[in-house]
Amino acid sequence: MSLEVFEKLEAKVQQAIDTITLLQMEIEELKEKNNSLAQEVQSAQHQREELERENNSLKEQQSGWQERLQALLGRMEEV
């Protein structure tokens, strides 16, 4: 009878070990996925910063062209 109890206990211990092993593998996969996503976020933030700089530059250029256009229109009205 104690052999049966020992075998049941051994089976439960083995099941626990298997579960722990699977969970450790899942943790490693999730860590890798997390690192990958963190890199994607960093890349997206960098791209956003570049686009914001480009947008500001284009706004400045547009403002400059509008000023030139207003100056030309002012000269045309004088003529």
Curated annotation (Swiss-Prot):
Keyword Signal: no
GO BP terms, alphabetized: division septum assembly; FtsZ-dependent cytokinesis
Pfam family membership, one: ZapB
The entry's keywords: Cell cycle, Cell division, Coiled coil, Cytoplasm, Septation
Region feature (Disordered): 36-64
Keyword Coiled coil in annotation: yes
InterPro entries in the record: Cell_div_ZapB
Polar residues compositional bias, start-end: 36-45
Main location: cytoplasm
Gene3D superfamilies, sorted: 1.20.5.340
Coiled coil region boundaries: 3-79
Subcellular location: Cytoplasm
Cellular component, GO annotation: cytoplasm
Feature: compositional bias, Basic and acidic residues: 46-57
Family: Belongs to the ZapB family.
Assembly behavior: Homodimer. The ends of the coiled-coil dimer bind to each other, forming polymers. Interacts with FtsZ.
Role according to the record: Non-essential, abundant cell division factor that is required for proper Z-ring formation. It is recruited early to the divisome by direct interaction with FtsZ, stimulating Z-ring assembly and thereby promoting cell division earlier in the cell cycle. Its recruitment to the Z-ring requires functional FtsA or ZipA.
Official protein name in the record: Cell division protein ZapB
Species annotation: Salmonella arizonae (strain ATCC BAA-731 / CDC346-86 / RSK2980)
